[in-house]
């Protein structure tokens, strides 16, 4: 069976920013089926329950399964880990970019919307993905290196550390992210 792909944006993001359009285009050019849900963002809207409701529509339609590859950025890695563990959904591969859990200190607005995504059983996600690849940077301006490394050390089957990558978003020059292509 053919793989399906999901790309999940981060806090206050959308499917139209950072490297999301680039990866989507690359998958589509290989005739892949790719979904880029536009999750609610902002204080009062961006929370685990709202994101869970939206992604559950895809799950209930049978679109998230053992042939699914999920790319996720920033707060989205912990969201998708939480989602897979809660729903006990097995997928093929997680490609997580700048993931973290239980980290506060970005600023009050980000901390408030991110906190609902966190959960205690992070290592359990290893039961629900055949591969977990974590990309992160040594100089992320939003999340401390130690928080991203701890996240990756807990779950990753492979880690890629980029020395000067910032938050691996468009502000850091990542409108294209060629290192992700090998995981399509």
Where are these regions (language model features)?
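Conserved alpha/beta-hydrolase fold motif
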Residues: 69-71, 94
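Active-site nucleophile loop of the alpha/beta-hydrolase fold
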Residues: 10, 39-42, 95-105
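Catalytic histidine neighborhood in serine/cysteine hydrolases
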Residues: 32-35, 153-169
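Catalytic histidine-centered segment of alpha/beta-hydrolase-like enzymes
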Residues: 45-46, 165-177
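Active-site catalytic motif of lipid deacylating hydrolases and related acyltransferases
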Residues: 2-64
């Amino acid at each position: 069976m053919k793989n399906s792909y999901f790309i999940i944006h981060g806090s206050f993001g959308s499917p139209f920013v950072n490297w999301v359009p680039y990866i989507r285009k690359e998958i589509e050019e290989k005739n892949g089926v790719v979904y880029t849900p536009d999750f609610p963002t902002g204080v009062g809207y961006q929370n685990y329950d709202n994101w869970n409701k939206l992604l559950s529509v895809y799950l209930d339609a049978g679109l998230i399964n053992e042939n699914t590859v999920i790319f996720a950025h920033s707060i989205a890695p912990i969201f998708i880990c939480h989602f897979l563990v809660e729903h006990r959904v097995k997928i093929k591969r997680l490609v997580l970019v700048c993931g973290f859990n239980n980290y506060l200190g970005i600023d009050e607005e980000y901390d408030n919307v991110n906190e609902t995504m966190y959960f205690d059983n992070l290592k359990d996600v290893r039961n629900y993905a055949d591969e977990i690849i974590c990309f992160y940077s040594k100089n992320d301006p939003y999340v401390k290196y130690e928080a991203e490394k701890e996240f990756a050390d807990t779950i990753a089957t492979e880690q890629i550390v980029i020395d000067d990558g910032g938050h691996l978003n468009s502000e850091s020059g990542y409108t294209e992210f060629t290192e992700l292509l090998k995981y399509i």
